């Protein structure tokens, strides 16, 4: 059982008031708040261990390098990757997917080849492939979903052809909360000798992720979704795949030798990390992962599921309530509309009550089109949220409903 009140003391922002109301932060799907330990790690890095890494013989550079590479090992162990060489630091999920979209397409795809995505993808797992489609003539195929917001695996199987080169799919929908059966989907793809990329941005903060068990070739996530800083993310890739893909960007550190006639590239993981990396961000991300480990990801998953069920039951008592996403296995995300109230109006009025939710299409316009709506109100929960906050939230939604 989590000691939620003790946890909340690590997050000073939760003590803030908005319009003289206690802040209720239900926008964790967009970004999470940061515990003191992570903020202090950033502060300590800049105050005491700030030097460019990998390139200096002096003490500070070596200390910063050691901290950065230890952070890489922390990520490796958190994901249960086989080697730290399989952990590439990026700016976030979006850059990680763009990296694979560019390098994989260059190495493994020709005009007419196909990538399979799902109807519930975030734009960051659609647009990079569309850019490659325009550049190289590849084609996107889309997995449909049923009325509950679950992917149709029978239709998924039918999408494969001799032109299919990659499956790129979200682990957890940022709108519906659906937890997709990505292990089964990976097995299906592997039956066709097709590699898999999984967008784990909404999964890693909320459930145990074991990349060796999932067996996908690539797995990506962002630090800021899991209590770490913005601007740092992770691309996990099986070493044999990262070895054969070309670099995404050129510059310092990703090279072995350079002449005007030829450049040879560095070994993994540095081949994909051109320029000065965010060595402060990497150590802060590692601190965030250690924080989550101390609480226990299984404890987090169980508690957030309890919050989800409690909030779902409460919202369903409200007249005109429509909750989008009724999958049997969901993450701590609730997207909804009430009657004819515009999602923006609901969000603005909840904000006046101190309640932070997200409104709009949530960077998933194709999914909104499939649902026949323009957008939703989204409440997304964390382990520092409480049932008392949910009670206030439900009362707030009901109060707004009565205004229209």
Q: Where are these predicted regions, by residue range?
A:
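Pyridoxal 5′-phosphate
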Residues: 1-404
